[in-house]
Amino acid sequence: MGENIAKNKKAYFDYFLEEKFEAGLVLKGSEIKAIRAGRVNLKDSFIRFVQGEAFLFNAHIGRLETTHHFYAHEERGSRKLLLHKKQIQKMIKAVEKDGYTVVPLQLYFNDRNIVKIQIAIAKGKQLHDKRNDLKEKDMKRDMERSMKDY
């Protein structure tokens, strides 16, 4: 993985991540420019399957002031994901199970400077699971603090 552009931190907190995939995105030139400028947010975004194809919904890619309105893009529009058919079929089967979904994790430039998105098959966490994660995180932080003193 190359340079990280945006990360969906909420997905790491709300879901158990099972299997990760790398996907390409179908984007316009104005969207690429906005992504390079860092005007992207994956919070509240999700992935749906429409007629055997994967789409990213509700991902915010802001407009640049320098882009002419004729070439401008939708800020929260749907964007097609580029995946192999076997990967899409695997994800569709996983989503059909109860409690499973596909979530976007992070947007980044790969080694060839192409925008990629990392997505994962995920299972939703219960409230007690989230509490346990927070407790473990606090304990780990306290341990590191105490180790730092010695």
UniProtKB/Swiss-Prot annotation:
Gene Ontology MF terms in the entry: RNA binding
CDD domains: SmpB (cd09294)
Highest taxon of the lineage: Bacteria
Compartment annotation: Cytoplasm
Record-level GO cellular component terms: cytosol
Pfam families xref list: SmpB (PF01668)
Designated name of the protein: SsrA-binding protein
Family: Belongs to the SmpB family.
Keywords: Cytoplasm, RNA-binding
Function: Required for rescue of stalled ribosomes mediated by trans-translation. Binds to transfer-messenger RNA (tmRNA), required for stable association of tmRNA with ribosomes. tmRNA and SmpB together mimic tRNA shape, replacing the anticodon stem-loop with SmpB. tmRNA is encoded by the ssrA gene; the 2 termini fold to resemble tRNA(Ala) and it encodes a 'tag peptide', a short internal open reading frame. During trans-translation Ala-aminoacylated tmRNA acts like a tRNA, entering the A-site of stalled ribosomes, displacing the stalled mRNA.
Signal peptide location: none
GO biological process: one example: trans-translation
Cross-referenced InterPro entries: SmpB (IPR023620), SsrA-bd_prot (IPR000037), SsrA-bd_prot_CS (IPR020081)
Gene label: smpB
Cross-referenced PROSITE patterns: SSRP
NCBIfam families in the cross-refs: PRK05422.1 (NF003843), smpB (TIGR00086)
